[in-house]
Each structure stands twice: as C-alpha cells, then as structure tokens.
Design a protein with these regions (language model features):
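Active-site rim/loop-helix segments in enzyme catalytic domains that contact anionic ligands
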Residues: 1-129, 157, 248, 254, ...
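The feature marks non-catalytic terminal segments
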Residues: 2-7, 161-266
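Histidine-centered catalytic micro-motifs
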Residues: 23-27, 145-146, 220
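Active-site environment of divalent metal-dependent phosphoester hydrolases
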Residues: 30-31, 57-60, 139-144, 174-176, ...
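A structural signal for short, well-ordered beta-strand segments and their strand-loop junctions
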Residues: 50-52, 89-90, 133-136, 144, ...
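Short, well-ordered secondary-structure micro-motifs
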Residues: 61, 101, 146, 178-181
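Short, electropositive alpha-helical surface patch
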Residues: 104-109, 150-154, 189-192
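Active-site adenylate/phosphate-handling loop in enzymes that bind or generate adenylated species
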Residues: 119-163
Length: 266
C-alpha cells in the first residue's frame, strides 16, 4: 500500500481555545515521534499539554554528566519551548530501562507503578484541561520498550475514563524501510524480538510536516544533546525519515484530523 500525502502548506483553520494532552515516556520521544504535530497544533492556536512519564535516567549520555535526570529534564524543557508546548507535566516515575536490566526492579520505575492509578491521574488532568484528545503510543509502544508499552496502557485507560478520542503514535515500518537513518534503528536493536511500528494499512492518520515544522522538529531533537548526535540531524535523509508522523486513531475523528494535510487512511 502506498501513502501519498500533500506536503504543501496546510489549509485548516484556527484551533484557539482547544486542548490536547500528549503523553510520552522519556525526554526526546516528544520530538522524535510527534514534534511536527505538536508544533502545528501550537501554531494553529491549540493548547498542547505535554506529559512525560520519566526523566529518562537510563538513557546513555554521549558525554559525561553528573546528574543525567537533571540534564534530560532541562533538555526536555528546551525542546518543549521549540515545539510551542503550553504546559509541561512530569509524572515523576523513573526510567525502567530495558528488559533484563536491574533498573526494571527499581521501586520507582515506571514498570513498578500502579498504571491504573497513573491513568486516573492523567484522566483528572485531561478533565481539568478540558482536553479533546489524548495522544499516547500504539499497543507495542512503537518499538517494544517497556516504558512505552506502559505509557500506551496509561493513555488508553485515561481516555477510557474520560471518553476522549485517542491517537496512538506509531511509525510506518514500510515507509521507514526505505527512508533515511532513524533513531529507531538503534532502539529496535536493543529490544529483541520486536517489530517496530505498524504496516501502512493499520495506520489511520498521518501528518506531513511543512518545512518550518520540520525545522522546529529538528531543533527540538537537537535540544536533546545528551542523547542525539547533531551529525544525525544533518543527514541528507533526515526529511525522508522524519517529515511524516503517524497515528492509529481510536474513537471518532478529532483534533488531529483537523490539522490540514493530515490524511485519514481508514
């Protein structure tokens, strides 16, 4: 199946006074998987509330740091500013790391949390913010990271409590097979036995970034200097790998479907 998207300037109207809650597992996920979408929402006047579950303590820094959690929180704040996020909320759980790591047994690890309780907390936030939609991950957490799977469960539970439309962030594995280098190349190698993303036919909604949105996404990714090599962002294949963002929608058409060159596929 071939997906053709109009990459010209979107024509949708303003979204002033409307809100979406975007849930991610670690700092940098917001930029990599939803950066262009968040930037477009903000540019159209929507209020974007970014919720990040952990500080990404188990991410391997590219250089020596004294407090990786503090560094990554600061990077997240800079990235959120680049993307136009109106409010940043940290759930305060600890990065669980990967299967087999001792960190998964840490009492504060996201994997050890009561996910229903976290979902209830998120639902209260959704109601307080009067958000119309919740963005989370697909059922496999895009590439099988345990924290991403947990975030999927938390997001779906909160959406179920509030009756909101859910957009499950994912990637199109058929597209990325032919695209340039992507951070998922290394991520999937660290999680064995998992196929990343979805095939094109499973994706319901896709957004093509405009040049300005892609530039904002690149800047947001660049803010995460402890994790992302700036040279990767200068790769000639950057646009091929990152200009599209994909979702599986659960529920009626909602806010993300009103963003212009977003195409509903099913």
């Amino acid at each position: 199946m071939t997906l053709l998207l109009d990459t010209s300037l979107p024509t949708a109207g303003r979204l002033d006074g409307r809100t979406v809650v975007v849930l991610h597992a670690h700092p940098d996920d917001e930029a990599v998987f939803t950066g262009a979408t968040v930037r477009r929402l903000a540019d159209r006047g929507a209020r974007v509330v970014l919720v990040t579950a952990t500080a990404g303590e188990m991410g391997t820094p590219r250089f020596a740091v004294d407090d990786i959690a503090a560094v990554r929180r600061a990077e997240l704040e800079r990235a959120a500013e680049e993307l136009g996020v109106a409010r940043l909320v940290l759930l305060g759980r600890r990065d669980s790391g990967l299967p087999g790591w001792e960190s998964t047994a840490h009492p504060d690890a996201l994997l050890r949390a009561d996910l229903r309780a976290l979902g209830t907390t998120l639902a209260r936030l959704v109601e307080r913010e009067q958000a119309e939609a919740v963005v989370t991950y697909d059922a496999d957490g895009i590439y099988g990271h345990p924290d991403h799977v947990a975030v999927h469960l938390v997001g779906r539970y909160a959406a179920g409590l509030t009756g909101r439309t859910v957009y499950e962030s994912t990637v199109d594995r058929e597209h990325l097979h032919f695209a340039g280098a992507h951070v998922l190349d290394a991520a999937t190698a660290s999680v064995r036995g998992t196929r990343y993303g979805r095939v094109t036919a499973e994706i319901t909604t896709a957004l093509a970034a405009t040049p300005s949105e892609l530039a904002a996404k690149r800047r947001a990714m660049a803010a995460h200097t402890s994790q992302i090599d700036p040279a990767e962002l200068d790769d000639p294949g950057f646009a091929d790998a990152y200009e599209l963002e994909w979702f599986v929608r659960r529920g009626p058409a909602g806010l993300l479907d009103e963003l212009g060159n977003v195409h509903a596929l099913a």
